[in-house]
Amino acid sequence: MLRLILSALCFAQSVFSVEIIAHRGASFDAPENTLAAMNLAWEQNADAIELDLWLSRDGRLVVFHDADAKRIAGVPRKIADLTWAEVQQLDAGSWKNAQFKGERIPTLEFILMTIPKGRRAVLEIKCGPEIVPELKRVLAASKRSPRELAIISFNFESLKASRETFPEIEHYFLHSYKKDPATGKFPELKPLIARAQAARFHGLNLHFDWPVDDRFVREVKSAGLKMLVWTVNDAAVAKRLASAGVDAITTDRPGWLREQLR
């Protein structure tokens, strides 16, 4: 009986050690990548927020996921082709719910000012390395500690350039689990680990479709890398990943997921 109790306590402890990252804020309940979503994430006790970054035509760091504004604001123009003044005119909330009508697209500078003490922001670079100089300026002006930040990207060159510019900030290589159209094969872990090590990234941030189990996580961590997963909105999947030893889980529902992991 004592052994069973100790085993249960160890499992609970491993679950609670998992960092919960709010995907584009609390995006299940509020419009993604808006101040409303970020504030709600903190209310739901998220450990961190994840947000996406593009450069506007005039060089501002815009918090937005898609390359264009059609899905969110009904405007089929690329963020990179819009000035910041034009971006400010877009309604980023009505598509989600009428109560969010008029919600605006924020800048990174603004979001960084709202992060509570002890929490952090995970910044996803959506474009090329040209974003790095402005990112350097904004992060320096924010006075945020490197411990309050992490940077992620699917774009290897962008992430590499960022890693070289911000050696004190954790960097994670994003990767999906889809078949290569040319070979028909799924990606393999070992080459991915090798790339991350060569670029001196701090870890991998993988889609939960990867065959993640205890052995998988051990292989990543034995290579000196941390292991993050996205985007998990299923309690059973989250519990499996937590028990396997992942460091963080990204979810659209941070408050709900924390309750499920109790």
Which residues make up each language-model segment?
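Hydrophobic core
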Residues: 9-14
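Sec-dependent signal peptide recognition
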Residues: 1-8
